[in-house]
Amino acid sequence: MPKRPDIQKILVIGSGPIVIGQAAEFDYAGTQACLALKEEGYEVILVNSNPATIMTDPTTADRVYIEPLEPEFVERIIRQERPDALLATLGGQTGLNLAFELDKRGVLRDCGVELLGTKLSAIVQAEDREQFRNLMFELGHGVPESEIVHTLESAWGFAERIGYPIIIRPAYTLGGTGGGIAHDRESFEQIVESGLKASPVTQVLLEKSIAGMKEVEFEVMRDSSDQAIIVCAMENFDPVGVHTGDSIVFAPTQTLSDRDYQMLRSVSLDIIRALGIEGGCNIQFALDPDSFTYYVIEVNPRVSRSSALASKATGYPIAKLAAKVAVGYKLSELKNPVTETSYASFEPALDYVVAKIPRFAFDKFESADRRLGTQMKATGEVMAIGRNLEEALLKAVRSLELGMEELHLPQLSALDTEQLEHGLIHPTDERLFIVYEALRRGYSVETLHQLTKIDRFYLQKLNRIWQAEQQLIKEPLTSERLLEVKRLGFSDVAIARMLSMDTEAVRTKRKEWNIRPVYKMVDTCAAEFASETPYFYGTYEVENEAVKTDRESILVLGSGPIRIGQGVEFDYATVHSIDTIRDAGYEAIIINNNPETVSTDFSISDRLYFEPLTTEDVLEVIENENPLGVIVQFGGQTAINLAASLEANGVKILGTTLEDIDRAEDRKAFEATLSAERLAQPPGKTATNVEEAVACANELGYPVLVRPSYVLGGRAMEIVYEQSELERYMRHAVIASKDRPVLIDRYLTGIEIEVDAICDGTDVYIPGIMEHIERAGVHSGDSIAVYPPQRLSEELKQKVVDYTIKLAKAFRIKGLLNIQFVYADDLYVIEVNPRASRTVPFISKVTGLPVARIATQTILGTSLKELGLGTGIHPESDSISVKVPVFSFAKLKEVDPSLGPEMKSTGEVMATDRTLEKALYKGLVAAGMNIALKGNVLMTIADHDKDEAIALAKRFDRLGFRLMATSGTADCLEAEQMRVRRVGKIQEDGETMLSVIERGDVDLIINTTSRDALVTKDGFLIRRTAAEQGTLCLTSLDTVEALLQVIESLSFQTVSIPAFTTFGVMV
C-alpha cells in the first residue's frame, strides 16, 4: 500500500528539553521523521520547545513552532494550523503524554485530527500498568506477580503479602521517574509516595522483585498490513534491577541460546501485533538464566533511547522508516537506505559486536547517590563497535572521556575487601571497574557471578582481558603479542602504562611491525548484500573497506557523550559544519561515538567513523583518509583538548590556530592579551598550591571565584568567602599542579553579558548580545538568557561590540568565539572561548542567522564581506526571546539544587513573545515550572540577602500570597508590616519547614544559601525535599524577580475607586 493520499498536513510533536531519561535520541528520531515525511511531499508542522536541536531548524519542517509542550499551547497550534494528522510517537514520553491529554480534552476530535502510527488505545494499553498486565495475561505471557495501586494505603497489603524487595513502577513516566526498589518498609513508603506523585494518572505498579534475572530488549517494527520484524535484540550486562539506560548493553545478544532467542522473538511479534502498533516499539524482558521462564517487564509503544542505539548499531533507520509506515507504507515497499538494494522487511544481521556504556554526571556531583536502580541517572552514552566483545567494550571505555583508557581504575585499589564486595553486590556507575578490580585481586568468575548475578560469559570476557594484560606485562613484547592485545581493544596509552613505556614508543613499534587498524563497513546485512554505506568502525583485521576517494576531504571532530556542560548544542553546531563542508564541494568526514545524535546518522556526512575521540583513534582515521585539515571548533572541550596532540603529529588544525587557542585558555597569556588591548578583567591570579592560593586571595580580597584551568561547564568552580573555605577547596576539590594551576579571581556581582561572534581574520560579525537574568556567580548555562538585552544602555551595548571586535582580532580568531562579560560599574571580560558555545543554537534561532554555517564558511576561506556581512552587529529582533535552563534534580539524589558557578542543568528551552513577561512565562512553563498565581511562599533567606528579599516579599504580599518563614526571616518581614505564618526550623518541635513541604502546603520556596554549617545543612535538606516533592524552589533572587514579573503581568489589579472631587474641593 503506497502512502496515504487523504493526508496533506502532519503535526509532529518533539520531546522538549534534554533531561535524564530523554536526551538527544529524540532530536535524531524527530529530525529523521520530519525529513522522511517532507520527502514524501507532506506539509510538516513541528512543535518543540528545545532550541538546541537540528529538529527545530526552519529547514527540517515547513513550519517550526518553538513553544511549550503543554496542552494549551499545542491546542492553539492545532486550531491555527488545522493539520490532518498528528505524529506523537517520535516525541518520547512527552509526546505520548501530550497526545493522551489532547485526546482527553477532545481537541483531536473537535479539530478532526487523526493520530498516526500507534493508536491511542495501544498507547494506553502499553502505558497503563493495569491494562498492560491484563493484556499479557490474555496472551499467556508471564509478568511478575504484581498489583496496581492509586494510594499508599492500598499498597501496604501487597507488601505484607509478598515481602521485600518490591519494585515500584509509576505509570506514564520517563526513565523510571519516581520508581525504585524498596528493601524495607521505610523505603517502600517513600518510593510509593514519590511514584504516585510522579505519575500523571496517580498510578503505580507494585511488582515482586525479579532483580538478578537477565535483561533483554527487542526492538520491533510493524506496518499496517501486519508485517513485523525484529530490528535488533540487545542484552544488558547488568541483570534486572538496573535501569536499562544505566546499564552496559551489547548487541546482538551474547548469551541467549537459539531456543531462547526464537522464544523471545515470537513473544515480541505477538505483543506488537496484539497492541496494533504501527511503527517502532521496544519490549523489555527478564529471562531466567537457568530455565525458559521469562517475564515481560514493559513495552514502550514509541521510538525510544534503545531505538536510537538499535538504529546506530544496525544501520537500520528506525525513526525514518517508522514515519513512512505511519503514513501507510508497508515495510516490503520501503528500500533499506543503507544497502539501497534490500527492503526494510529484511531483519538486520550483524557480523560485529556493539557495546553501549552510559555516561554519568558524578564527576560533577561528588555528593550524589551513585547507586543504580530502576530510576535512570545517566546523562548520556557512548557506543563502540568491534569484531569481538572485548574490543567493543574497551573502545567504549575510552570513549567515555574519564581520563583513562582501560578497565583498571587506580583509586579502587584503596578499597578494602568489605568495600569491594559491597560495590559488587550494590551496583554503582563504577560497577564494571569494580568487577575488574576483583578479578585483579584473584576473585573467581563463579564467586563474582554469585555476588553480582552478571552472566558468567561476560565475567569470562573480562577475565580474558585481565589475563591478556598479565601476559603483556610478564612476557617479552613481540609483534604477535601486540597484535593480540590490539585485537582485544587495548589502546596504545593503556599498553604504554602496563609496560612503563612512552605512548609514542608503542605507536612507533606498532608502525614498525605494520600493526594498523583497518575500517569495516556497517551494512545491516553482514555483507549478504552489496552496500555503499559510508559508515565505518576500526578493527585489527586484514581487508580495509574504507578506501579513500579522489575527493579533497575535511574532518570534523564530534563532541562525544552528552554530559552536563557539554550537551546536544555542540552536536547541533557539528551537523551545521558538516552540511557546509559538503555544500562547499569537499568530502565531509566525522568521527564521533554518541549513538543518540544527529551527527552519527550515516546520511549526514560523506563518511562516518564511529570511533573513540582519542589521539590514537583520530590519528589512525586521518592516516586512512588524509584530509586537508581538521576542524575542532564544534566538538566542545573534547575536540579542543585533542588539538595539541594532533598538531604535534603534523595534522593541520583549520580555523583558529592552536597557538591562539592556547592564548585564550592559558591564564597568563590571556591576561597579557587583555592588558595589551587595555580591556578590564576581574583582578585575578593563579596558584599551584594551598599556600599560593591563600596569599593570592588575601591580596585580592574575599569573596573570590576559584576554578581549575581548562574545564567546561564550570566543573569544580566555587565562590569562597573566607580562608578556611579556600583551604578546603584546594585540598579536596582540585588537584593543583604547575601544569594545572587553579585560577583565583575577585568575585564581582553584576549583570552577566554573553556574546557569540564570527571572525574571518579581518572582519568580526556579532549575531547578537544576550544578557543573563541571574547576576554573575550563577553559571551561564544555568542562567536565564534574554535576547535582545533589556537592561543595557545603547552606550554599553556599543562598548560590548567594540570589546568583542578587539578580542576577536587580538586572539586572531578564524571562525567562532564566545565571550562572557560582567557589568559592575564598568565592563569586565570574564572569559573568551575560541570555539562554538552552548548558545550557538539559541542565537541562531532568534536571529535567523545560521551561525555555525557562517563560521564554517570563514574557516574554509570565504570572507564575511563575501557573505554580505562584514564587521558589525546584526539588527536586533523586535520580539523578545528567552533561553531557560532545565534541571534533572529529581533523578539525582543527594545533589544540591542550589545554583552557583558550577553548571547543573541538563537541557534548555526557548520561548519568544512580544514582551519580556510573556516570553518568560512561556519559558518558565516550558521548563516545567508550575507558576502559581496564589498560595503559600516559604522564605528562608541568608542574612546577606535579607534587604533584597524583603522588597520581593512585599510584592508577593500585595499579590495575595501567604508568606511562611522561620523566626529570623519572619521577624524581618513582620517589621515591614507583612503577615507571616511562622514555621519551625528542621530541628525544632512542631510544624517545621520540612513538614509543610512534605505535606504539600507550599507552592513556592525561596531559599538563599548561607555559609553557616548548620544553616547550610538545613538549606540542603529543604532544597532536596523540594526536588523530590516537585515543589518549585528558587535559590537566586534574580530568578524570583523574573518570576514575580511574570505573575504580576498575569494578575489583575483590584483598586478601590477614589472619592469624588469638585473643583479641588472634596465632596
Curated annotation (Swiss-Prot):
The keyword Manganese applies. Mg(2+) 1 binds at Q284, E298. It is an enzyme of class 6 (ligase). Keywords: Amino-acid biosynthesis, Arginine biosynthesis, ATP-binding, Ligase, Magnesium, Manganese, Metal-binding, Nucleotide-binding, Pyrimidine biosynthesis, Repeat. ATP 2 binds at R707, R746, L748, E752, G777, V778, H779, S780, Q820, E831. Pathway: Amino-acid biosynthesis; L-arginine biosynthesis; carbamoyl phosphate from bicarbonate: step 1/1; Pyrimidine metabolism; UMP biosynthesis via de novo pathway; (S)-dihydroorotate from bicarbonate: step 1/3. Mg(2+) 4 binds at E831, N833. Mn(2+) 2 binds at E298, N300. Residues 133-327, 671-860 form the ATP-grasp domain. Residues 1-401 are annotated as: Carboxyphosphate synthetic domain. GO terms for biological process: 'de novo' UMP biosynthetic process; glutamine metabolic process; L-arginine biosynthetic process. It catalyses: hydrogencarbonate + L-glutamine + 2 ATP + H2O = carbamoyl phosphate + L-glutamate + 2 ADP + phosphate + 2 H(+). ATP 1 binds at R129, R169, G175, G176, K208, I210, E215, G241, V242, H243, Q284, E298. Its cofactor is Mg(2+); Mn(2+). Pfam families: CPSase_L_D2, CPSase_L_D3, MGS. SUPFAM superfamilies: Carbamoyl phosphate synthetase, large subunit connection domain (SSF48108), Glutathione synthetase ATP-binding domain-like (SSF56059), Methylglyoxal synthase-like (SSF52335), PreATP-grasp domain (SSF52440). HAMAP family: CPSase_L_chain_A, CPSase_L_chain_B. PANTHER family: CARBAMOYL-PHOSPHATE SYNTHASE [AMMONIA], MITOCHONDRIAL, CARBAMOYLTRANSFERASE FAMILY MEMBER. The large subunit is composed of 2 ATP-grasp domains that are involved in binding the 2 ATP molecules needed for carbamoyl phosphate synthesis. The N-terminal ATP-grasp domain (referred to as the carboxyphosphate synthetic component) catalyzes the ATP-dependent phosphorylation of hydrogencarbonate to carboxyphosphate and the subsequent nucleophilic attack by ammonia to form a carbamate intermediate. Composed of two chains; the small (or glutamine) chain promotes the hydrolysis of glutamine to ammonia, which is used by the large (or ammonia) chain to synthesize carbamoyl phosphate. Tetramer of heterodimers (alpha,beta)4. This is Carbamoyl phosphate synthase large chain. It comes from Exiguobacterium sp. (strain ATCC BAA-1283 / AT1b). The gene is carB.
